[in-house]
Amino acid sequence: KSHFGGEYAVGSQHHSSLKYASMTDETLITVYAQETNAYPGVDMRRALSLISLPGIQKPLLIDLFRVSGQLGFIDLPTHYLGQFIETSVPLSAQAGTAPLGTNHGYQHIFEEATGRAQNADGLQFSWLASNRFYTMFRSTESGDSFTHGRLGANDPDFNLRRDPIFIHRRTPTTDQSTFVSIIDSHGEYSPVTELSTGQRSRIRDLKVTLDTPAYTVANIDLQSGDRFVVAWAHLDFAEDTIHEIQLPQGVLRWTGPQAVEAM
């Protein structure tokens, strides 16, 4: 279902609440906001960060999406441009091209392929756009489903661009669910030499290791063997607050609402 029931007039009466933003540290640029009006009884929080890690060519985009309350199913779409390369979740192509639904925008999306996560090992999804490679890593839960679709259904006058979309669906078993994603921009393809360089991401794995009402922690493992921990605070956003939590690899201690540490 669309935010605010798809009613523009209702949505115009509300705006998300900014919890914190930091733009001064070039190694960690971040913004965190909360939305409590889009769905009755549902609290949505989203944090977007650009972080720079040693050994990674360009800054990584880290996306935290956290939902709590009266939850049905959650669809988290990734709209992208370019050529699909591969995904770690096996997809089965659909014989026909039927719309995903009848309302709330689903009627305009063709269903091209579907798949389901068999475990919580996480998703990797790669594509090529403007001669550059992109890989998205996403935390998953067993039973999560995925749909690759394309805009353009029920569009007799061809007003919609036929852009691809990758939809991650989860039906939570509790009143809280968290998605953590990383998008890595890496390498390039030369149309002159027809050669690719750096087509594989230097990230090996992404896992959420702690998710409580107060904190979320994710591990980023690199191909080099290095590990970095990203932590978010959800209750206290003061810049001078000292946070301390126990992790399997040791104690993580930091100041402020978010941290990126090597561990």
What annotation goes with each model-predicted range?
Residues K1-T97, D175, S185-E188:
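Catalytic and substrate-binding regions of extracellular carbohydrate-active enzymes
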Residues G11-E26, G115-A117, S201-D211, L252:
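Short, exposed beta-strand/loop patches in secreted or surface proteins that constitute
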Residues M23-L28, Q34-D43, I51-P54, S139-S145, ...:
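Accessory, solvent-exposed terminal regions and/or long lumenal/extracellular loops of proteins
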Residues I29-E35, L61, A117, L123-W127, ...:
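Generic recognition of long tandem-repeat/solenoid scaffolds
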Residues N37-R45, Q70-D75, R116, N131-M136, ...:
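Short, surface-exposed beta-strand/loop "edge" segments at domain boundaries and coil↔beta transitions
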Residues T78-S142:
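Polysaccharide-binding surfaces and accessory modules of carbohydrate-active proteins
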Residues G115-A117, D157, T178, I182:
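Mature, function-bearing regions of proteins
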Residues I167-S177, I183-M263:
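Non-catalytic terminal regions with compositionally biased, polar/charged low complexity
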